[in-house]
Amino acid sequence: PTQKYHDAVRKMGEYEEQYDLVACSGGDGTLDEVVTGMMKREKKVPIGYIPAGTTNDFASSLHISKNMLEAADTVVNGVPFACDVGVFNQDYFVYIAAFGLFTDVSYETKQSMKNVLGHLAYILEGTKRIFNIPSYRIKVTHDGETIEDEFIYGMVTNSRSVGGFKGITGKNVVFDDGKFE
């Protein structure tokens, strides 16, 4: 089990080569760490995901069962499929890379509050940030065009749900097209 930040990345670096599948159970953050650890390995194997977090956005987008036994059965008996992996500052992601307003909420919300209140704990933590909204000077180059301005939020994602909110990125999210929304 993981106990602290980057435990899963470290454990991925320590496991021996004889495995043909890695299964993880946790939230979006745990999956992110496992993916990061896997991408740093020379030999990559499929990752099975059993969602057990607060919002499980990525699992929801993939229609992975919230029932842990059903999800575990899919990990063992399901068919592996490709999934886009993004990289930002040498950190890998499959769910989201973001900056700005509310991006620290999932990290700053106490686990005890998430255990009791679930998604509502994130909303309550987020309300603390409403009156202190910093901006960031960002330069973005995309499709040959460069935009430079002040932004309060930005994200790149491959999910139909972000922070427990569905529909933010639209319905046409494809997980293996080489593009992020």
Where on the chain are the PLM-derived regions?
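Internal helical hairpin/lid segments
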Residues: M155-E181
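Redox-cofactor binding/interface segments in oxidoreductases and associated redox assembly factors
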Residues: C24, D32, V156
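Short Gly/Thr/Asp-enriched flexible loops that form oxyanion-binding sites at enzyme active sites
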Residues: T30-E42
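Catalytic core of DAGKc-family lipid kinases
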Residues: T2, K40-V156
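ATP/NTP phosphate-donor binding region
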Residues: P1-S25, T36-G37, E70
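Short glycine-/acidic-enriched loop or helix-start segments at secondary-structure transitions
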Residues: E33-V35, A59-S60, F165-K166
